[in-house]
From Swiss-Prot:
It comes from Passalora fulva (Tomato leaf mold). The lineage of its organism: Eukaryota, Fungi, Dikarya, Ascomycota, Pezizomycotina. Residues 1644-1667 are annotated as: Disordered. The gene is claG. Residues 399-833 form the Ketosynthase family 3 (KS3) domain. SMART domains: PKS_AT (SM00827), PKS_KS (SM00825), PKS_PP (SM00823). This is Atrochrysone carboxylic acid synthase.
Amino acid sequence: MTTNHLENKVHAATESLFYFSNEFPKRDLQDLFRQAHTRSKLAQHKCLAQFIQDATQTVKQEIQGLSMKLQHLFKPLESVLTWAEDHELREGALSGAIDGVLLIVAQMTTLIGYLENNTAKMDDIATASLAGLGVGLLTACAVSSASTIADLSATGADAVRTAFRLGVHVYYVSQTLEALDPSARPETWAYVINNVTPTEAQEQLDTLYANSTQPATSKVFISALSRSSVTVSGPPARLKALVTGSEFFRTSRYIALPVYGGLCHAPHVYGQDDVDMVMQSRAFSVQKAPATHLKSVWSTSSGYPYLVEDSKSLFASVVAELLTKAICWDSVVSSIVKYTGLTDASEMIIYNYGNSIPLNELESALKSSPAKLKVVNSNLLSWMGHNSPTSVKPRNTLQSKLAIVGMSCRLPGGATSNELFWDVLRRGVDTSQVIPADRFDVATHYDPAGKQLNKSMTQYGCFIDEPGLFDAPFFNMSPREAQTVDPQMRLALVTAYEALEQAGYVANRTASTRLERIGTYYGQAADDYREVNQGQEVSTYYIPGGCRAFGPGRINYFFKFAGPSYSIDTACSSGLAAVEVACQALWRGDVDTAVTGGVNILTNPDGFTGLCSGHFLSKGHNACKTWDATADGYCRADGVGSLVIKRLEDAEDDNDNILGVILGAGTNHSAQAVSITHPHAGHQAYLARQVLRQAGVDPLDVSYVELHGTGTQAGDSEEMQGILDVYAPLSKRRSQSQPLHIGAVKANMGHSESSAGTTALVKVLLMLQNNVIPPHIGITTEMNPKFGHDFKKRNLHIPFELTPWEHTDDKRRIAVVNNFGAAGGNTTMILEDAPMRSISQSDTRKTHVVVLSAKTKTSLVANVDRLISYIDSHPDTQIANVSYTTTARRYQHVLRVAISTSEIAHLQKQLYSHREKIEYIQPVRKAEPPPVAFSFTGQGASHKSMNLELYRDVPTFREFVHQLDSLTRAQGFESFICALDGSHDKDHQHSPVVTQLALVCSEIALAKYWASIGVLPNIVIGHSLGEYAAMHIAGVISASDAIFLVGRRAQLLQERCKIGSHLMMAVRASVDQITQSAAGKPFTVACVNGPADTVLAGTKEEIEVIKTPLESSGLQCIKLDVAFAFHSEQTDPLLDDFEALAKSGVIFAEPKLPVISPLLGKVIFDAKTINATYVRRATREAVDFLAALNNAQEIGAIGGDTVWVEIGPHPVCTGFVRSTIPSVKLALPSFRRGEENWKTLSDSIAQLYTVGVDIDWTELHRPFEKNLRLLDLPTYAFNEKTYWLQYKGDWCLTKGNTFYADEQKIVRGQLPSVSELHTSTVQQIVEQVFDTDTGSCTVVIESDMMQPDFLAAAHGHRMNDCGVATSSIHGDIAFTLAEHIHKKLGVHGKDTRYNVANLQVTKALVARKNTANPQVIRVTASTTDVRSGIDLVWQNINANGDSAEPFATSSIHAGISTDWISSWSSLTHLVRDRIETLDRLVAEGKANRLSHNMAYTLFASNLVDYADKYRGMQSVVMHGLEGCADVELSTKESGVWTVPPYFIDSVAHLAGFIMNCSDAIDAKKFFCITPGWKTMRFARPLVPGARYQSYVKMIPTVEDDTAYFGDVYILQDGVIIGLVEGIEFHRYRRILLERLFSAPDSTNLDDTTETKDISSSTQHSVPVSRQVPPAAKSSAQTVFESSLPFAVPGPRKSTARPAVDEIAAREKPVASQSSSITNRAMQLIADEVGVELADLCDDVGFSDLGVDSLMSLVIADTFRATLDIKVNGSLFLDYETIGDLRNWLEETYA
């Protein structure tokens, strides 16, 4: 045994003791656990969360070890914390085990959380002793065994395991002593007897049992003792008999203890075996920490610390004590007092969970001890307040609260905005109305009696006004598409945009708005528009415009969100269920932003009829009569709502406005309801409690519940019961300060079904914003009598008028939205107030940029008007917030207005002014912003000392400057910061070194700042000293080298030149004018800045001399305030040394941007021009700014559209630019001397924005963002028109027929039902005749291509996204028939193999899209003598059973495999040599090796997309038209084949790959296909999983440069075992691909045959509009099938291509036809898109018209059919604008 650690510890002035009681804390246990759960979500409480998780997992494991009878006592366990509220479980059979676990969990969660908040307190535990009573001793064991806070999770879980096992074991043993009735109230196993001594009590018991025959195990005994009381324990019946029958005990004051779990502290019942059973090794994870690491634990039986070897034995000792030893707390108190008396301590800190009698006894004893200790009582519960912290980061996304940051709606009653919706609610409006005519004709579809078929019994509903209103061009839809697209989708798009706009969303602005991390989730339960409106005339957009998945998909596509998009249908709860799914995605971390909502637009009369028939609907003229006694069903309603949700911490980081916070959400199902459509109160209550637990919310803290409240008797009463049970129970009543209000929006807006939950959620958010609960208008007679009359007792209220719902600082408002669906789903969501926000300081900028933009001028005018109205209503709005909201938090469109302003009044005035000019605004081209030129100012433009506000306000600019200053000081130069930061007066003169470095470095920093806010230069120019900054920004020199050159040059100037000896003078004249006016006086030109701007330099005397005649001539002369005369002879003394320094110390690189050189008067692009000599010359020679600009303009480097930004302290170069290039529209300064930086910058930024430069507004505002607020400005003003397909007539009443079903039976019945031969491609023999004497036969088979294996084989070879029968399918058919015929005629031998020869495919066999219809082919095999071969013919069969012209022919010849291999052996070494050569070329980098994935990806992108089974090539080597491949055949088998097509293709389609993927063929313009081959033979079977090599070389023919031939060799283990000889390929223009390979039932083709005849195809991209006369057509009809593109060497004569020749011979249209064709094409486009011809301006893009891929196909097909212009849909990608297409048409037909 080891010694206890108290003997070895170093004593301190303060001793610590942790006391773990056997009683629960006085605080409400549910509330305690709720707080623990809430705090476990925070990042600082990871150990707390881990303990709760470990404890939960531990009890789950223990429950699994129980008998099934006991397991059934437990409900599914989410968290051990939930046991606190399970009263049934706590009062049941295992109450001892349950309460033991809960006590430990309560103590451990409190302790761990306390230590995580106060980590230093772990040191107190390390030196403390531990005391406890009962199960509390197990908590002490856990703490004793832990060395760190993290250890407490594992040791605490073991304490939980021990307590549970102990409780279960005690239950089992106690049941053997006295079996209790589980249905009766639990009875106690212990009484405390007061005012008696242990001796007296024991004497009484001894006397009582002296002559008793009771078994010892049934006797009452003393289980705990103290000086003045004892606790007696025993079986309940025996114990009750004792205290009522014994006079001694009856007359003593006794109290029944809450001990219901069984007997403990009973040495006569338990022994070591019982201890061992509890401590069994199964799943016990206590780490055996040595005794030296343990804290001392005081034994309650001996009064001394346990003497143990390790932590496990400590647990075992405590278990033994709890089972077999009586409690003697007095001895513990005495020992602690005695121990402390031996120390030097003057103070004892007792950590505990609240006052208790044992703890008070200990405190009293310590205080009265001789040591007179000061006792400090430290309550561990103190850290856990009643309100959870609001500003602490969550532990991970699962623990995050969620913030709703944007919302928008379209609802009945004219509620087309959030504000109008609130107005409807506030005024208590019932929005029901007669069904409007745009939905359907009520007169013909209404029958109140319900006797007429398919008619509705109600004529009322709640409807959105004009649901067809939509801005189609804004959302890139054509009018035709917009009209077809379901208005649910359209309004989802619109409300999503508005919600995102309210949220201040800009793509990729922050981490949470990355496009890849945004998903959409929308609820939709009906497809009315598709079923009725669209269904009247099914068109191109029927599927993408009507199928539900396209709703959220369209939102993702429009906004380019790359996250998930879900359409969710849970009936009436779809909307809120979609929001809940979005929340779960945010909690899981799947997305960072969710756009979610619900949609419902009613147009189908069947919905009304069906719901009336199911008794769902009210017949009256009212919205839902929610909670009314006469409620008779609900009123159907429209509704569309969208919300934007983020995690709360992201929303706060993003500076979003938070409308409300989601604490929890969940969905379950009413599985026990009486019917699927009937709600269930129990399941709704279960869900509510579950979500409340997860959210950590006390139900009594909920102050408002928005109920589903449909106005049905069943739904309302069930829902109300669930709400009352959870939120307003009678068992635990609400206080007067906790009123609960309930409401239901359906009383106003009707039941919008799949949008109902979204509507309710928006209502609650508006209530939070407005601090008012709107009146409930559903009760018009009296309240539903089923609800009872105890609302007052429950403190529950229904508001019948506007009721205040104020926010208070000390208490958050919590609301619940409850929603359920007719399919049985229930969804609940808990919300609370947004956290309060405060602004610490205001924006230091005085001038700001406010912008407005739109896609149309109409919208822009309306946007301006809306902002003016907003300012009128909010005159106190801060201009900084308007700027922030309109710039950084709004999408920017092509029509733009920008205003630089400093006050609201000025802004409003400017808005009026700009409104009048909108007519003249031109749209910017976002894809082509104007080029930007940076001009860098030279010396002398600024004050001697600057005070840059940009340096003061912007950390990034300041950091740029500091980095440059650090480089400056590192090179030994003086810091230049003092010349920029305002620390000196503006006229303070600095040294030349500081002045020049300050100028260049501030310009570098300024250029980088412009770049950081999105303004990047395309070209640069520097004036004099500014050229160094320009060179750095262009990438010629590094910043360090720029500083080196400028600093050393300035030093040399100081050392070699005298300040003031020379001057520079600006003259407002040209050099010629100066020459004429100089009167012969000499002068030096330093700078030629413009046509009339020249700077002279010279000695002081020279300048004075020249100045006089110049001024006399009327020329303006200004002396420049510079220390030295640059570009003059004054600099001569330093030139040699300066050049040497530059040559040895600086690296000059190739410019990354063009540099306009004022020295050379030209633009520099190369790496050699700027060097050491250049900077020498630039110091001495003249600056010719004029010549430089002229040269740049001449070569096109700059132009009139170039935007100039001057980088420097004052605009100088801008004037030079304007005078030299008058066409320049914008030349803008960065700073202006004497003007605040932000004023100048704002003015320039505003102008840059209006010409199309994309400003990074987020970066511009970043330094000030926390002081800015996103305003809820008016939404974008859409330019809406009505797009609506009206339901016509009454066909919904009369629909139904069986015509198509009967037709299908006829067609399906054409094939016989049985067949002697049946494979996947040879399915039915319809005729066969054999003559064994002559060897003749005829066999006719038919196969349906729609048979799954056949169809899969075709779709395994996809071209133009269609399944195409590869030639290898025809090969398999041929092999199958050959083997069948030879076997039938008795001529099939062991080594017999078959040669499929002379295959010619004249038409492609393309699979139908509609697989419901059969697609039958017939193959006829015939021969007069099988030894001479068999002829095969392929034909299509139509629905009537008639055969079409043959589309393929072939012949079959038998051969001997060994003969073939022998004949090929002479070629083997040649083929192997070519393969080795190809491998060598790869090693030399002259050939390409492609991997499996790369090869097939390339193949798919160029022509054929193969299924996995076809993808046998593992690697490919390609060199021109020659190649080889390593092949491994698939082992995945399906179907019945003779030679599987995917085996043939795998070994042979190398030829097709070469022809379509080699760089020898232009795959962008052409594709290559094969009509067949000469022979195809395999000497060995093709085996699954076997490996082969293929080799081919394709050779163009001499006769036809579009025809190629080759031989494909197949090798196995170096031996040729197969040959596809004479495979043929022809090259076609890619524009023909769609024409040749489209499904026969495709709607965009006029050819409806089963195969695609390409005999009329052409190589010309645009065939003529005039038809060829019949006489010109060729008789031959050779056509080429897509199939297996293989190919090979060995030229032979090309097959005839008369069809191609015929088309090539067509005449081009004459020039006079071109304009006609162009005009007709434009009209066709206008008709298809649904716009006026006048709208098709040249600069209009097809994407702007809504021409997507589908519309492209439609227009292309219309061109083919009407104009005979054969194009495909990619035409509108190649020619993006109307003008581009118009030019192409004109050029083609000119």
